[in-house]
Each structure stands twice: as structure tokens, then as C-alpha cells.
């Protein structure tokens, strides 16, 4: 739990320096690549993009900054969704969704969220985008015109969002006090159900018509037991199918089409079978193996073609981090450098 306390204190209160910006190098267009959104420091305005070529195993830093006339991406890049040739980046502290051409990261526009609070997480469905915000709103926007279509008030502090069976499933974290998944009909844009889950649901995904949500639970240093939970939901009926307890405050996770989940907790990476709702390996990869400074893993991505895990190492949360690549047996393959606090890992194939 000391590891998680360090993570909480550091990411909440520390002000970071800027990622180094050496002489910009020419940016290659992306083919098979890993894209890392580095959050940067809290209120430091130094969020950045790192790309990594899977084919030649080389990384390029400060990509957005370099191709956009040395313009900063903004404060706290929090999510990235790719649709066709566009990338939609939630930049929470700058109250915007930045829109880029995904092959070169040139800016083609932005969606202003000043009136709704910083965008947190994004999902795209049927040419419409949906974003949760720090002011407890759900914002619907057109991905072609980049105009806001509608807004809906949600419960306190919504976080993760996914789409399944014509519905949006939204984790209502309440900064730790929330305990529900709100379901919104996409066509009517109305709340149709609230599903009660364990405290502090933050991360959510869908595989077909099955929705998986991770509740982080309460932290022991706040009087909690540190026990989180995976909740499996049928998207059609909107009913809970099964639950699975996970120790050490689980958080972000990645998954594959076989319903295997790779969940970050205080000890490292937990390997879970979603089909069986069972823990395959409680510590597939230890946090200390990835990060020997603060013993914390910050993000996780899964390359389904190579069957590799990409793990974000924030080091001490104030210096540039790295991505560590592991196979599914827990063996390290390689690492590459990224910016400060690598929080989102996306694959472009």
C-alpha cells in the first residue's frame, strides 16, 4: 500500500518540470506503431506524444510539438481514440479535445470543453463521439464537423466510458465515493439504468456485448480495505453476470479478444480470465520489475498481433518515463523512452 500512497501523493500534489525539448527531428508518418500520450505534470502544460515503430523498434518524442510549430499539446493528455485517419485526444487540463491526422499528428482542429469541464475519456460510436468530463457531464459531439451536439448531466465525476449494444456504459467514480455504472441509450441520449457496483469504478471496456468494469475500491490509508472488483455485465439486459474481487486497488487494464484482462494493481499486473472470471496469475509481472524507483506501473496496453504487453513506467513521476515491453509469460523484451507520466498507450496498425 505504500506504493499506492506514493502514487497518490505524487500525482496529486507535485508540480513537474517540462519534458526536455531538444532540437526537433523530422517526424516519419506512422505505419505499425505504438502511440503514447504522456500526461506531463499537473498544471505544467507539458503533455506530449511519443510514437514507437513496431517494425524498426525506434521511438520519436515530442511528436505533436514538433509538427505543429513547437506548440504544446496542453495540460494533461488523458485519452486517445483513433477513427479512420483522425485521432481524438482528451486534454483534460486544457479543456479541449485536440483533433489530429493520425499519420503525422498535425492539428486539424479542436473541440472546446470550457463550458463543460475537462474531457476525461472518449468513445466513438456511429460517427458520434462521447466524452466524460471533470464537471460530471457527458458531451456528445460530431466527429466530422467537430461540433458539440448535446450534453447530459451524470453522477459525480464520471471516468471510463464504452459502447455496446447501442448503449453507453459510464463508470461513475465520484472521486472514490461513486458506486455505479450509468447506462445511456445512444439514440435517445437518455439515462436508462444505473447499475450498482463496488466503490470507485474508473475503468471500463466492452468485448462484443459483454462489459467489464474495474472498481478500484477504497484505499487502506483512507480507512478502506484495498479490495477492488471486476464486474462483468451483459450489455443487452444491463444485468450483472458475475464479479471477481481483486486485491491491492486495481485500476487501469488492457484486454484481448479472448477476454483475457491484464489489470494494474499495487503489486503489478494481474492476469485474469474474463470468461471464467478467475485470476490466472495474481502477479504476472511485478511492479518492481517495471519500476525500481516508485514501484508503480502507470499504464498498460496490449498488442494483439504480437501478444505483447506494453507497460508505462513513470519512474518518480517527475522525470521522463519509459515503456517496458513484456511477453505473456512475464519476460521482458525491451524498453523505450517516453515523456513524463505515460498514461495512455494506443496501437495503430
Per-range role (PLM):
Residues 2-8:
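Sec-dependent signal peptide recognition
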Amino acid at each position: 500500500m505504500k506504493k499506492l500512497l506514493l502514487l497518490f501523493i505524487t500525482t496529486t500534489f507535485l508540480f513537474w518540470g517540462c519534458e526536455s525539448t531538444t532540437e526537433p527531428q523530422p517526424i516519419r508518418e506512422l505505419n505499425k506503431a505504438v502511440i503514447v500520450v504522456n500526461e506531463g505534470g499537473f498544471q505544467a502544460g507539458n503533455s506530449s506524444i511519443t510514437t514507437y515503430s513496431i517494425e524498426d523498434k525506434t521511438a520519436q518524442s515530442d511528436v505533436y510539438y514538433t509538427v505543429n510549430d513547437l506548440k504544446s499539446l496542453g495540460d494533461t493528455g488523458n485519452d486517445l481514440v483513433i477513427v479512420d485517419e483522425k485521432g481524438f485526444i482528451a486534454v483534460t487540463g486544457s479543456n479541449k479535445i485536440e483533433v489530429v491526422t493520425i499519420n503525422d499528428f498535425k492539428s486539424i482542429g479542436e473541440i472546446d470543453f470550457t463550458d463543460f469541464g475537462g474531457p476525461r475519456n472518449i468513445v466513438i460510436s456511429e460517427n458520434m463521439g462521447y466524452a466524460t468530463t471533470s464537471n460530471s457531464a457527458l458531451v456528445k459531439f460530431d466527429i466530422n464537423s467537430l461540433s458539440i451536439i448535446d450534453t447530459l448531466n451524470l453522477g459525480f465525476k464520471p471516468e471510463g466510458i464504452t459502447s455496446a449494444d447501442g448503449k453507453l456504459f459510464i463508470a461513475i467514480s465520484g472521486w472514490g465515493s461513486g458506486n455505479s455504472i450509468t447506462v445511456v441509450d445512444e439514440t435517445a441520449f437518455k439515462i436508462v439504468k444505473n447499475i450498482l457496483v463496488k466503490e470507485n469504478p474508473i475503468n471500463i471496456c466492452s468485448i462484443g456485448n459483454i462489459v467489464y468494469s474495474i472498481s478500484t475500491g477504497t484505499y487502506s490509508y483512507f480507512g478502506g480495505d484495498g479490495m477492488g472488483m471486476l464486474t462483468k455485465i451483459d450489455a443487452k439486459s444491463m444485468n450483472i453476470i458475475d464479479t471477481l474481487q481483486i486485491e491491492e486497488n486495481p485500476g487501469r487494464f488492457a484486454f484481448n479478444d479472448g477476454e483475457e484482462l491484464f489489470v494494474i494493481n499495487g503489486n503489478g499486473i494481474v492476469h485474469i480470465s474474463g470468461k471464467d472470471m478467475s485470476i490466472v496469475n495474481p502477479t504476472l509481472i511485478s511492479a518492481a520489475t517495471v519500476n525500481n524507483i516508485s514501484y508503480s506501473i502507470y499504464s498498460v496496453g496490449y498488442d494483439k498481433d504480437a501478444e505483447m504487453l506494453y507497460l508505462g513506467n513513470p519512474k518518480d513521476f517527475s522525470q521522463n518515463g519509459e515503456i517496458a515491453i513484456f511477453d505473456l509469460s512475464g519476460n521482458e523484451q525491451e524498453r523505450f523512452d517516453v515523456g513524463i507520466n505515460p498514461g495512455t498507450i494506443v496501437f495503430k496498425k
